[in-house]
Every structure is written in structure tokens, then in C-alpha cells.
Amino acid sequence: MDHRTPTPDNPWLALRNLTPARIALGRTGTSLPTGAQLDFQFAHAQARDAVHLAFDHAGLASQLSDRGRESLVLHSAASDRHQYLQRPDLGRRLNEDSIATLRQHAQANPGGVDLAIVVADGLSALAVHRHTLPFLTRFDEQAAADGWTCAPVVLVQQGRVAVADEVGELLGARMTVMLIGERPGLSSPDSLGLYFTYAPKVGLTDAYRNCISNIRLEGLSYGMAAHRLLYLMREACRRQLSGVNLKDEAEVHSLENEDSANQKGNFLLGKG
């Protein structure tokens, strides 16, 4: 504090460089500084916009096609955004036209597949637009050697997490992966969530799903998310289950892990 800035120094200020969280905002009297208040209002507006942003399924389907991936565009039983937000149950099921489309595809491609990837707007189409393709690129790179068979990428408008169960059941998929926009936060309007289910069928609860959340540049990297998903897929097939009975114990190779492995004794007591 000096004569030019007559406010006390904030010892938390240096921590702002380490996180996008709203910490060390400062104060003016008993209130927030104007800048911090405006930033809050802007972040809140971004979160609201993310919820109501329309899902550009046509653009995403075109980008997938450019990368050699087939896609199917479907719709949940929620007719529009207003109904989707007020009736979560309708977002968990497909409409009749979409069910017919999947049945026709399954009849034309009998035998089922290992994996059905479903993409839905959820509560942030912005997250889906930004992160779906980069994640799938990294996933394909890491999964190439495993020989998984995949259904076309299914794009569901006004979809919620559980709609992937119906998609997987109709396609005869052993596993489903749902990529969906998470509820926006004040510092993360574009967070992508991933939900993995083994033996999908209508009526499963969240206890049968594994979640990998906050996939974005400022959160969990695409490569790490793909690494964890592949671990879950391998373990789910080996143990024939998913959800609360399947823990994410994927090994992550890093400098910190290597240092820990090489260090002997208790780190609290120093090197032995």
C-alpha cells in the first residue's frame, strides 16, 4: 500500500496467475472493485449464452466427414430448447424418427460394434463446437492399435447424458461414449464432459457410468482424456462392467511420477 494505491496489499494476488478461479478480486471499501464486478457480469453473460447457443450439428457433421468419419444426426424427444430445459426426461430419449433411423442402420449393419460415440449439445454447445474434433483426433491416434470397431458418430440435438444408452442399445454397441457440453461455470463456459457406459440399455442410472470431466485447454487435456477413456474401455471389457465398480486407475507418466518412483523413503523425512 502506498499513496498512489491506498488499499492494503493482497497476499493472494500472486495466486491469480495459477488459476482461472475467481480469487484475490480485491475490494473497494466493503465492495468489489469495478473491474472485478464487470468481469463477473461478463462471465455470467458468457455462461448464459453458452446454454442457449444453438448446436451447429451440420457444421460438425461436415468437419467429421472431412476427416473420414461418418455421422448420423438425430433429435431427442425434446422438441426445442425451452422444452429441453424444462423437461430433462425428454432429453434422455430419442424421438420416433431418430429411433427409426437407428433401427434401419442396425439392420443394414448387423453384428453390432464395440463402441458408439454420441455427441450432444447438453448445456453448452460451445464446448462441443470447440473440443469434440480435437478430442476425437487424439482418441483415434491412441486407439488405432487396439482395433476397436465403431459406429458412425451420432449427433443428438437437445440431448442429455442418458440418451446415449438408447443409442447404444439400438446400435448393438458393447460400449457408449457420450461427449456433452457441461453446465457452464463463471470461469468455464466451454467445458466438455465425457460419460462412458458398458452394456448400454435404456433405464440405466448414473451409477453405471464413468465420467471424465472438464475436457478443455484450461482443464484436462485431450490426450489425457483419451488415455483415461481407453483405460476404462479395456478394463470394462475385461471385467464386463462400468460405473462405480470401475475405477480410473490409469497410470500417468510424468516427471513428477518419475521423481516419486526414484525417491526412496518418506518424502516428509527427506531422502534416505
Swiss-Prot record:
Gene Ontology MF terms: cobalamin binding; ethanolamine ammonia-lyase activity
Top-level taxon: Bacteria
GO cellular component, one term: ethanolamine ammonia-lyase complex
Catalytic activities: ethanolamine = acetaldehyde + NH4(+)
Predominant location: other
Gene3D superfamilies named in the record: Ethanolamine ammonia-lyase light chain (EutC), Ethanolamine ammonia-lyase light chain (EutC), N-terminal domain
KW Lyase (keyword) present: yes
Keyword DNA damage listed: no
One of the protein's GO biological processes: ethanolamine catabolic process
The EC number(s) this enzyme carries: 4.3.1.7
Pfam families referenced in this protein's UniProt entry, alphabetically: EutC (PF05985)
Cellular localisation: Bacterial microcompartment
Keyword set, alphabetical order: Bacterial microcompartment, Cobalamin, Cobalt, Lyase
Binding site for adenosylcob(III)alamin: V161, E182, C211
Cofactor requirements of the protein: adenosylcob(III)alamin
NCBIfam families in the cross-refs: PRK05465.1
Protein family according to the UniProt entry: Belongs to the EutC family.
UniProt subunit comment: The basic unit is a heterodimer which dimerizes to form tetramers. The heterotetramers trimerize; 6 large subunits form a core ring with 6 small subunits projecting outwards.
Function of the molecule: Catalyzes the deamination of various vicinal amino-alcohols to oxo compounds. Allows this organism to utilize ethanolamine as the sole source of nitrogen and carbon in the presence of external vitamin B12.
Name by which UniProt lists this protein: Ethanolamine ammonia-lyase small subunit
Lineage of the species this protein comes from: Bacteria, Pseudomonadati, Pseudomonadota, Gammaproteobacteria, Pseudomonadales
Chain's gene name: eutC
